[in-house]
Amino acid sequence: AKITFTNNHPRTIWP
C-alpha cells in the first residue's frame, strides 16, 4: 500500500 497526499488529504493507494 502507498500513502499519497492530495490537497493535504491522505489517500491510500492499493496496487
Curated annotation (Swiss-Prot):
Single GO biological process annotation from the record: defense response to fungus
Compartment(s) where it occurs, according to its Swiss-Prot or TrEMBL record: Secreted
Any Gene Ontology CC annotation: extracellular region
Keywords: Antimicrobial, Fungicide, Secreted
Organism domain of life: Eukaryota
Keyword Nucleus among UniProt keywords: no
Principal subcellular localisation of the protein: secreted
Known role: Has antifungal activity against B.cinerea, F.oxysporum, M.arachidicola and P.piricola. Inhibits HIV-1 reverse transcriptase.
Family from the record: Belongs to the thaumatin family.
Protein name, per record: Thaumatin-like protein
Origin species: Castanopsis chinensis (Chinese evergreen chinquapin)
